[in-house]
Amino acid sequence: MVVDADKKELICSFCSKKQHEVKKLIAGPAVFICDECIDLCTDIMKEESKVALKQITASIPTPQKICKILNDYVVGQDKAKKILAVAVYNHYKRLEYVQSGNNDVELNKSNILLIGPTGSGKTLLAQTLAKILDVPFTMADATSLTEAGYVGEDVENILLRLLISAEFNIAKAQKGIIYIDEVDKIARKSDNPSITRDVSGEGVQQALLKIMEGTVASVPPQGGRKHPQQDFVQLDTSNILFICGGAFMGIDRIIRSRTNHSSIGFAANINIDKEKNNNEVLKSLEIEDLTKFGLIPEFIGRLPIVTTLEELDKESLITILTKPKNAIVKQYQKQFELDDAELVIEYSALEAIAEKALVKKTGARGLRSILEHLLLDSMYKVAELKKQRVTLTKEVVDGLIEPVMTSIISTKLNKKQQMIEDIPA
């Protein structure tokens, strides 16, 4: 016990001030601390938190820099890139503002909803953001989620994945980003009330509301269902940014129906509207269309930023095949190079591959499977033969002939012989 030897008066163990010199003196096991030292310690911890947060925000690129990096990997979708870049940047500026203790204006979190057809780049945008940002990031599939108490995955497991991504550093996880894919699959199944619970639709939306808005969630570190006796980790989701994505198949019909019925001259407008492609129709998206699709108003309210991605055309698909840093053609050419072989794809073949993907309506996602199918036999052979050049032509893509394989050595010899023959006698 710390006591002044002269007056037998209690003193602070840290600053040695006497009890009568301070407002409060709090006792611990054989030690005391005064209110002034407590305030000082609190200020020090706040300052350290600010420094840690500034280190995070300082490492976040500006929106223009984020867009520039996204352009290296994602083709097109300029509007979506801009919205994502600004949202991510503002998210971390908001954290810095909240941490500063300045409460004159309350800044709310702005989660994001990405709507676009399959293979338009929703998931790739999120994955690329994960590479750009030095913050914890995780992806989840909404189709595997169910309401608590039913067979399936609880929404708290999404937070567990974020914790794992942050190596169970709670402070880092609370500043992370969560991408929920296929969110359109948890739309309410019907507008009519039913005697059976919609545990994988509206029930999941209800379960996601709290964690998206901001709450202190109890996260089971070993998974929720197999270890019921474990201690839970408390995770504050107030500063976690949620990005949701989905194809929302059929929402274009809902938009067309609304715009037709709200116009004068019904029959004429149907003909005009039919001429619009889905990219143009999605630009007219309203909140009521999402409600009609099956998202509950409370869930939509947690996603204030809504943007649409355009369906990719043939030129965009060809660009995706060849231009980005991680372009699919570049990846396959590198694989052939590792086998001491070459892969040559003619432009007409690239056009045919893009057209196939458009017919299948798989977007960019289907390009790899098409190439994998075309090159399977060639990859099987070149590992043994070596020094081979494999050429893909339009006829190969159309299934008329097999990929053309020639020896690189013989090709070089033929060129050398041709050069000798061309030399004047």
Curated annotation (Swiss-Prot):
Residues of the ClpX-type ZB domain: 1-53
Its job: ATP-dependent specificity component of the Clp protease. It directs the protease to specific substrates. Can perform chaperone functions in the absence of ClpP.
One Gene Ontology MF term: unfolded protein binding
Assembly description: Component of the ClpX-ClpP complex. Forms a hexameric ring that, in the presence of ATP, binds to fourteen ClpP subunits assembled into a disk-like structure with a central cavity, resembling the structure of eukaryotic proteasomes.
Residues at which Zn(2+) binds: C12, C15, C34, C37
Keywords per UniProt: ATP-binding, Chaperone, Metal-binding, Nucleotide-binding, Zinc
Residues engaged in binding ATP: P117, T118, G119, S120, G121, K122, T123, L124
UniProt name for this protein: ATP-dependent Clp protease ATP-binding subunit ClpX
GO BP annotation list: cell division; proteolysis involved in protein catabolic process
Protein family per UniProt: Belongs to the ClpX chaperone family.
GO cellular component: HslUV protease complex
HAMAP family, sorted: ClpX
Organism: Rickettsia typhi (strain ATCC VR-144 / Wilmington)
Pfam families tied to this protein: AAA_2, ClpB_D2-small, zf-C4_ClpX
